[in-house]
Regions:
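A generic structural micro-environment signature
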Residues: 7-10, 49, 132
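Histidine-centered nuclease catalytic patch
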Residues: 1-19, 27-35, 39-42
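C-terminal, charged low-complexity interaction regions
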Residues: 81-176
Length: 176
């Protein structure tokens, strides 16, 4: 959940918005840094929400075997390499630094221009989500990944090895 006013104790319907875990961390980049769950990349050719769908498929595909796992690892490497351009343009790829600058160091006039100035910068979701609870730290991501792959998850139990068949069927239907 995302809390529009930043107050996690305000559970009113006007304040609470449901989001996927990847979208939520875009709104709270400082938390993404705390959980070690995202880094900044330069990727102007892909919108943020589309990147989330791509990355989710990459992580599900990566834990399979065979060509789909190899392709997923290569795709992840390509995305991670885009960190360098973010560092070159912004001086950092760390989400918490971006959040701090936006929150504490720029004037209202510059803040109003953030969309234009940061066009092309994306928060790349990583394959970890470090949660602290009762003095313990654990990586929640394996559980999230297991859900995505489950019959109730967004991939509906469809194993990555079958994805090429789904794509080919969709392509044939689109062309007929």
């Amino acid at each position: 959940m995302f809390f529009r006013n930043g107050d996690r104790t305000d559970q009113s319907t006007k304040n609470v918005m449901t989001t996927c875990i990847f979208c939520a961390q875009v709104y709270e980049m400082d938390r993404a840094a705390e959980m070690k769950s995202g880094v900044l990349i330069w990727l102007p050719e892909i919108e943020q929400h589309v990147l989330h769908h791509i990355v989710r498929a990459i992580y599900v595909g990566r834990i399979s075997q065979g060509p789909m796992a190899d392709a997923s690892r290569r795709a992840q490497d390509v995305l991670l390499a885009r960190r360098e351009e973010a560092k070159r343009r912004l001086g950092t790829d760390e989400a918490n630094i971006m959040a701090m600058v936006l929150r504490d160091y720029i004037t209202p006039r510059h803040y109003a221009q953030r969309t234009e100035k940061l066009k092309g910068v994306r928060l790349l979701p990583l394959d970890r989500r470090i949660i602290q609870e009762s003095g313990l730290q654990f990586n929640q991501f394996p559980q999230i990944l297991a859900y995505w792959r489950s019959k109730d998850g967004p991939f509906g139990g469809k194993i990555p090895a079958q994805w090429i068949n789904f794509y080919q069927e969709a392509l044939m239907k689109a062309n007929s």
